[in-house]
């Protein structure tokens, strides 16, 4: 099981699982890549029992992603590379190793990843009713 749900503390490792394995991931839809190629790899360390909170490590090749209606709230801690985020009003912030940021659900703008970008992430998806 690659996502722990037991009632134990889990150490986050920058290279993924304890054996250093990171698997292909596909968070970025091809039609949202505005520049470059999004080759994603990562590892999920934790998913809660409701399935709406996930914690992992994620890396991506240099590219620019368009965010139309970001699907979840997300907190990121940058491990490597650079992330430049521009919101729909044109405000830009740049994050490098050691920085952390939060993306709210519904965000509209662009994410530009420079270098082999890598971060830890926590996502919280909206709870589904009924």
Spans of features found by a protein language model:
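Short acidic-glycine-tyrosine-enriched beta hairpin
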Residues: 89-105
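Ligand-binding loop in jelly-roll beta-barrel domains
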Residues: 105-129
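Conserved short histidine dyad/triad with adjacent acidic residue
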Residues: 43, 47, 51-70, 104-105
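Short, conserved beta-strand element in jelly-roll/cupin
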Residues: 60, 70-85
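A generic structural motif
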Residues: 63, 73, 80, 86-88, 90, 112, ...
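Short hydrophobic/aromatic-rich beta-strand segments that constitute the beta-sheet cores
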Residues: 67, 85, 119-121
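A short, N-terminal "cap"/entry segment at the start of jelly-roll beta-barrel domains
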Residues: 1-52
């Amino acid at each position: 099981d690659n996502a722990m749900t037991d009632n134990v503390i889990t150490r986050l490792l920058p290279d993924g699982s304890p054996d250093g394995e990171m698997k292909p991931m596909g968070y970025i839809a091809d039609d949202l890549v505005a520049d470059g190629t999004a080759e994603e790899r990562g590892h999920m360390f934790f998913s809660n029992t409701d399935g709406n909170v996930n914690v992992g490590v994620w890396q991506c090749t240099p590219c620019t992603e368009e965010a139309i209606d970001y699907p979840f709230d997300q907190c990121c801690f940058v491990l490597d590379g650079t992330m430049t985020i521009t919101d729909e009003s044109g405000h830009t912030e740049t994050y490098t190793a050691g920085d952390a940021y939060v993306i709210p659900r519904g965000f509209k703008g662009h994410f530009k990843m420079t270098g082999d970008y890598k971060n830890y992430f926590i996502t919280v998806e909206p709870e589904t009713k009924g």
